[in-house]
Amino acid sequence: MPLYEFTFIAQQGLTQYELEGLVKGLSSLLTKNGAELLKYEYWGLLDFAYTIDKMNKGHYCMIYIKATPSSMDEFKRKVRLNEDILRFLCLKKDKLPKGDSLMIQASQV
């Protein structure tokens, strides 16, 4: 199964508890379609370069997913219907990176 990097921005009004619930919901949606969540990173509540839906900040998150292309298409379709997710980007990757992403490393400096 191919590997995907799925980065999304959630609404700024979500609490940490609600954000964890959102990620658990995404994870269960993936497992229902035969996919697997491999890694999750929370990058923080960051400012936007421009206003999105009258919001200036959002929770940035990234997950790595192993899924078939058809199950990934179904996952993206359902994510588009979720009002808590403002934007997302899905990229196909060759391999799972080792260690933390650059966003996590930059926040630790």
UniProtKB/Swiss-Prot annotation:
Domain of life where this protein originates: Bacteria
GO function terms (MF aspect): small ribosomal subunit rRNA binding; structural constituent of ribosome
Entry-linked Pfam families: Ribosomal_S6
SUPFAM superfamilies per UniProt: Ribosomal protein S6 (SSF54995)
InterPro entries xref list: Ribosomal_bS6, Ribosomal_bS6_sf, Ribosomal_S6_plastid/chlpt, Transl_elong_EF1B/ribsomal_bS6
Keyword Cell membrane carried by entry: no
Disulfide bonding pattern of the chain: none
GO BP annotation list: translation
Keywords: Ribonucleoprotein, Ribosomal protein, RNA-binding, rRNA-binding
GO annotations of cellular component type: cytoplasm; ribonucleoprotein complex; ribosome
Family recorded in the similarity comment: Belongs to the bacterial ribosomal protein bS6 family.
Protein role: Binds together with bS18 to 16S ribosomal RNA.
Protein's name in the database: Small ribosomal subunit protein bS6
Gene name, Swiss-Prot/TrEMBL: rpsF
